[in-house]
Amino acid sequence: MHRLPKKFSLVLFLALACIAIAAAQSNPAPSQDSATFDPDGTAHITRVVPMPATISTEAQSWLESLEHTTPGPETLAERRARTDVWRAQDSAEARKLYPVNVEEATTAGVRTDIITPLAMPAENKDRVLINLHGGGFNSDSGSLIEGVPIANLAKMKVVSVYYRLAPENPFPAAVDDAVAVYKELLKSYKPQNIGIFGTSAGAILSAEVAVKLKQLGLPLPGALGIFSALADFSRVGDSRQLFTLNGFPGQMQPTDEKHLDDQYVGKTDRKDPVLSPLYADLSGFPPSLLVTSTRDILLSDTTIFHRALLRSGNNSQLVVFEALPHAFWYHFQLPETKEALGTMAKFFDEKVGR
């Protein structure tokens, strides 16, 4: 996540070219908006973007604070180390705000955390959720941050999966691990009583796993939670061009070693229907909830996949939050986070096993 002042200027280049960050930062702030266009349609836009008045005061304060802790380019090792620090802090905060029991386990040979609500209604003992954490496929940014609040709010058991990470284990290793856990849970739960969800990389995996299960002829889960995802590794959505800017919340810095997409994709065809579910047969998909926000780098990709689900005749819901960056629901102090988590939990209660 990156830092945003109340009023700042930014130079956008809506193309696949790299952004000239140093030059943009050295230029004086413009007094008004302007735009020029190349013959190929590339836009060069100078904008003045004020702090949005349409979000909570807590969210405004948070966005303002992001200016002061913007990480620069980093190696994979540095990214993992930084992620481990804030994940531990945020996981502890999650467990304080949303009390649950957490037990380390191994499920189908895969490391998992079994997250159980302190008080689980009898009707929920036959329902379970699988959480696939975010982290760009190469680190763990949310195994407990995602699973703990949902287990507490939905009053359901959550199995959080520590799937194998790239680049050491590129696609389809993570999919295979998640499928193995799902198959193991099928021994104890009806498929319609299982839900799968995740944020960012975990959201992508949730869709990929559903496609893989369909290919394998296995029964599909009762619901999918796809919280800020892409479903096409062969093309870049518009919001990824728009928000991949230094200093603008929503940016995700690639590592210095290799682009994180390349690390995960490996040698797989980028239009492989499991890797990129947009190219799969999506008919018969479970009821799905997609959540994003207007400053999410994956806003475009999330909405593109939502439309694909609708075109295939599926029950798909899309919730778009105002003016907040990628995976903002990791930040528990925001009223918008409480609303987002409540929406997710309600969806699973209404769809899983119903």
Which stretches of residues belong to each language-model region?
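Phosphate-/polyanion-interacting regions in eukaryotic proteins
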Residues: L76-A88
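Bacterial N-terminal signal peptides
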Residues: V11-A20
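Boundary at the C-terminal end of the N-terminal hydrophobic targeting segment
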Residues: A22-S26
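Short linear motifs in intrinsically disordered
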Residues: H2, D90-L97
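Alpha/beta-hydrolase superfamily serine-hydrolase fold, recognizing
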Residues: N27-D40, T46-E58, S65-E74, K96-R354
